[in-house]
């Protein structure tokens, strides 16, 4: 089966997940992937609030980036754990592989809900559907099946996940279904203007850093690929999370890649369009993700070595797609 194909048993599997969660009497841990984005935080926080509304013993284990810290309340955070207690259930959301789940061990009864085509379908129960724009879209369906009464507090993080993974409805994954779901969530009292403002706010350090990043912009393969990186002496790594989105709109480009050096290697963020697969590029680099958006971490390499690997992988994908 094509890993990027829709899940043919989507509703059957999601109903089973809902039945299991309603029947669980022990603790439920909700976790997501390392370096969480809006979908990771939105889907996990929304499900956490829904389970709490059901009276479940739920724990939300996540570390949101600065621009998303307005969403959770202080008392909603739970500390990371090294071992789950007996009888615990783990719900892993938006995590393309078990090794990316952070804050909790992948053990106990594991439920895996995700929309990454490269997900290996881990867990005792898994619902993986790459046709969905966001894991938050899937969580919306799950919350409906749980029979929880929708409130603005539950709907706001869920809509956040959809907004961020669709680029505020600008990306190709914005389908009529996505817009219908968003409209329904708005009907539960989400303050859209306030939410979108908060999602776009960035600290002054972000704009100072922007100048340094833009000075590294380079064009390759006749402008088909645009790259940039975070200078190693720039600091403020957290402020660089969305710079790949800044360079993706260079006219004439079909691939954009942003690199940043970390202790374990170089993190590579990839975006693509025009029949080019960011997923294929990421897989060549040992990573994964979606066709239009993917990433990888090149362990043990410096920036120059990482650039060499990236250029080689992009060249192969541009050739496959007929651009070279």
From Swiss-Prot:
Cofactor(s) needed by this chain: Co(2+); Mn(2+); Zn(2+); Mg(2+)
Keyword tags: Exonuclease, Hydrolase, Nuclease
Gene Ontology molecular function, alphabetical: 3'(2'),5'-bisphosphate nucleotidase activity; exonuclease activity; nucleic acid binding
Swiss-Prot/TrEMBL catalytic activity: adenosine 3',5'-bisphosphate + H2O = AMP + phosphate
Annotated SUPFAM superfamilies: DHH phosphoesterases (SSF64182)
Disrupted gene: phenotype observed: Reduced growth in minimal medium, possibly also affected in cysteine assimilation.
Function: Bifunctional enzyme which has both oligoribonuclease and pAp-phosphatase activities. Degrades short RNA and DNA oligonucleotides with a length of up to 33 nucleotides, although the enzyme is most active on shorter substrates, in a 5' to 3' direction. Converts 3'(2')-phosphoadenosine 5'-phosphate (PAP) to AMP, has very low activity on cAMP and cGMP.
Cofactor: record remark: Requires a divalent cation; Co(2+) > Mn(2+) >Zn(2+) > Mg(2+).
Oligomeric form and interacting partners: Oligomeric.
Pfam families from the UniProt entry: DHH, DHHA1
Enzyme Commission code: 3.1.-.-, 3.1.3.7
Organism per entry: Thermus thermophilus (strain ATCC 27634 / DSM 579 / HB8)
Sequence similarity: Belongs to the NrnA oligoribonuclease family.
Protein name: Bifunctional oligoribonuclease and PAP phosphatase NrnA
């Amino acid at each position: 089966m094509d890993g990027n194909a829709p899940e043919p048993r989507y509703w059957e599997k999601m109903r089973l997940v809902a039945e299991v969660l309603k029947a669980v009497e022990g603790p439920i841990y909700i976790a997501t992937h390392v370096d969480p984005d809006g979908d990771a935080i939105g889907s996990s926080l929304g499900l956490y609030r829904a389970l709490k509304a059901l009276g479940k013993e739920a724990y939300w284990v996540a570390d949101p980036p600065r621009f998303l810290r307005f969403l959770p309340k202080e008392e909603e955070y739970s500390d990371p754990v090294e071992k789950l207690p007996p009888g615990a259930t783990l719900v892993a959301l938006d995590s393309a592989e078990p090794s990316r789940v952070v804050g909790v061990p992948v053990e106990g009864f594991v439920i895996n809900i995700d929309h990454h085509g490269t997900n290996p379908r881990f867990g005792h129960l898994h619902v993986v559907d790459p046709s969905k724009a966001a894991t938050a879209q899937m969580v919306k369906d799950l919350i409906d099946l749980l029979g929880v009464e929708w409130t603005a507090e539950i709907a706001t993080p869920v809509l956040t996940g959809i907004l961020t993974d669709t680029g505020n409805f600008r990306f190709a994954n914005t389908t009529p279904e996505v817009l219908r779901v968003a409209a329904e969530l708005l009907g539960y009292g989400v303050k859209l203007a306030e939410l979108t403002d908060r999602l776009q706010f960035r600290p002054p350090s972000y704009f100072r850093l922007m100048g340094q990043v833009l000075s590294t912009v380079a064009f390759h393969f006749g402008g088909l690929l645009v790259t940039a990186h975070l200078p190693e002496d720039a600091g403020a790594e957290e402020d660089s999370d969305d710079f790949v989105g800044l360079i993706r709109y260079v006219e004439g480009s079909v691939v954009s890649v942003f690199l940043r050096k970390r202790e374990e290697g170089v993190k590579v963020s990839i975006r693509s369009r025009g029949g080019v697969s960011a997923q294929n590029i990421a897989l060549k680099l040992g990573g994964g993700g979606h066709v239009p958006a993917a990433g990888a971490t090149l362990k043990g390499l410096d920036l120059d070595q990482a650039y060499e690997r990236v250029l080689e992988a992009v060249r192969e994908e541009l050739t496959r797609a007929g651009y070279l």
